[in-house]
Swiss-Prot record:
It is found in: Nucleus. GO terms for molecular function: DNA-binding transcription factor activity; DNA-binding transcription factor activity, RNA polymerase II-specific; RNA polymerase II cis-regulatory region sequence-specific DNA binding. It comes from Danio rerio (Zebrafish). Residues 184-243 bind DNA. Keywords: Developmental protein, DNA-binding, Homeobox, Nucleus, Transcription, Transcription regulation. GO terms for biological process: anterior/posterior pattern specification; DNA-templated transcription; embryonic skeletal system morphogenesis; proximal/distal pattern formation; regulation of transcription by RNA polymerase II. It holds the Pfam family Homeodomain. Sequence-specific transcription factor which is part of a developmental regulatory system that provides cells with specific positional identities on the anterior-posterior axis. One of its GO terms (cellular component) is nucleus. Belongs to the Abd-B homeobox family. This is Homeobox protein Hox-B9a. The keyword Transcription applies. The keyword Membrane does not apply.
Length: 249
């Protein structure tokens, strides 16, 4: 009967509770009645509220992190301690030098003719060169092939022009002058018998050539106008010398 009476009182009080009152207050006010009853076989027992005991602080209140620094006269900022790395032994040091990749070094002055490899860039970008200068090695045979060939004279003309255009030794170097000593006179340009005969015929016909006639003779004999002009000048000087020597005899 006591259990039924407490249950009826609990439900009656919960129904009659006013709207303005806190429902939690009325609920907790009847805990003293409900705590006296024994739990039934289908009900869970009610446990008292848990109370935790406060744990003692890890550090005492008298300890302060800055008191030791201030007493010792050290700066307040804390710098972490970084241990120094131990020096490896000689065997491991040499082994690491073999394993590590050697860095790319700048080309030495003696290595200027080596072509630098381009560096790989991102997709869509042209490769960049490190050295920035590209040297092209060209042989003497390739240089002769690439050089332009002048259109045409015979073998005697090529010999004459080659002798005139030959580069002499360095004038500032006395040893070169002594080693390559030669006469200052240029090599004479030989003419063929056919060219000499035609020039003699033209000279007997006219000692002085006009510009148009000189151009035509040079074209027919495969000579330059300068060669024809010089030959006529020499031939006139030779004839004057012969005319001067004839009266004396």
């Amino acid at each position: 009967m006591s259990i039924s009476g407490t249950l009826s009182n609990y439900y009656v009080d919960s129904i009659i509770s006013h709207e303005g009152e806190d429902p939690n207050a009325s609920r907790f006010s009847n805990v003293q009645y409900s705590s006296a009853r024994q739990p039934g076989p289908g009900e869970h027992p009610e446990f008292p509220s848990c109370s935790f005991q406060p744990k003692p602080p890890v550090f005492s209140s008298s300890w302060s992190p800055f008191s030791s620094h201030a007493s010792n006269g050290l700066p307040a900022v804390y710098h972490p301690y970084i241990p120094t790395q131990p020096v490896p032994s000689t065997d491991t040091r040499y082994l690491r030098t073999w394993l590590d990749c050697a860095p790319r070094a700048e080309p030495l002055p003696g290595q200027g003719q080596v072509k630098m490899e381009p560096l790989l860039g991102h997709l869509g970008e042209p490769p960049k060169l490190v050295g920035q200068h590209e040297y092209i090695l060209e042989s003497s045979t390739a240089r002769e092939i690439n050089s332009g060939h002048s259109a045409g004279f015979e073998d005697n003309k090529d010999i004459c022009e080659g002798s005139e255009d030959k580069e002499g030794p360095d004038q500032n170097d006395p040893s070169a002058n002594w080693l390559h000593a030669r006469s200052s006179r240029k090599k004479r340009c030989p003419y063929t018998k056919y060219q000499t005969l035609e020039l003699e015929k033209e000279f007997l016909f006219n000692m002085y050539l006009t510009r148009d006639r000189r151009h035509e003779v040079a074209r027919l004999l495969n000579l330059t106008e300068r060669q024809v002009k010089i030959w006529f000048q020499n031939r006139r000087m030779k004839m004057k010398k012969m005319n001067k020597d004839q009266p004396k005899e």
